[in-house]
């Protein structure tokens, strides 16, 4: 190894040694590990859920509803939070952090309002929606799906707001919090299922998803509040 490094020109070797020890590279490595860990934990959670429930009508219904709610939250997050990031950075450079944070609070309130309106619309059209999404289900499974849509609305609100807070934190270079917070959803779900392992049902999945998203949101809020004046 030393013979290989000896063949590298001195300026390049010096640059590499400084780069490998830099805080920036260490931060990138940490974010990479956390992001990769999040994918692994999510896979383990899914495998644990499948092994626990096996072939189950409840699991079929939950996966359908959870997938739709996650898609709806991600779809709503594709608008305001994504356009917020460049506007926040530009305003912070031109007018200062206080003015930019004020805009961030206003934008977060608008995004929360849009999520609340979406939740209200879902409540009003849940019967028609499930009729189209779950047309192959029997009546019992359709009724369960309608109940799960309503019961997963806290997840919709918390998960949807996490996109806004994620953009806010990324704008302030809080990459570790952004990378680590998604771990809380699968970890909480697995924890709740372990507590109820003797009699697992769909209620554990709903509780785990709602609690995990709430914990994720609280972690982000804590990080944001610590940087506000």
State where each predicted segment sits.
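Membrane-embedded alpha-helical bundles of multi-pass transporters/translocases
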Residues: 2-229
């Amino acid at each position: 190894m030393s013979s290989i490094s000896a063949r590298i020109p001195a300026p390049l070797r010096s640059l590499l040694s400084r780069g490998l020890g830099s805080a920036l590279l260490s931060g990138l490595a940490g974010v990479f590990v956390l992001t990769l860990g999040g994918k692994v934990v999510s896979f383990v959670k899914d495998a644990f859920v499948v092994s626990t429930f096996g072939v189950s009508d409840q699991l079929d219904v939950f996966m359908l509803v959870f997938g739709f709610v996650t898609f709806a939250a991600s779809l709503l997050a594709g608008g305001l939070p994504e356009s917020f990031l460049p506007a926040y950075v530009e305003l912070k450079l031109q007018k200062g952090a206080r003015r930019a944070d004020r805009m961030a609070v206003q934008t977060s309130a608008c995004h929360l309002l849009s999520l609340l309106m979406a939740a209200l619309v879902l409540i009003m059209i849940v019967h028609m929606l499930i009729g189209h999404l779950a047309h192959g289900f029997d009546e019992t499974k359709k009724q369960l799906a309608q109940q799960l849509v309503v019961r997963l609305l806290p997840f919709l609100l918390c998960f949807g707001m996490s996109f806004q807070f994620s953009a806010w934190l990324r704008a302030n270079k809080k990459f570790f919090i952004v990378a680590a917070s998604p771990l809380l959803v699968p970890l909480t779900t697995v924890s709740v299922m372990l507590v109820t392992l003797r009699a697992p049902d769909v209620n554990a999945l709903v509780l785990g998803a709602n609690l995990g998203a709430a914990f994720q949101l609280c972690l982000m809020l804590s990080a944001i509040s610590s940087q506000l004046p």
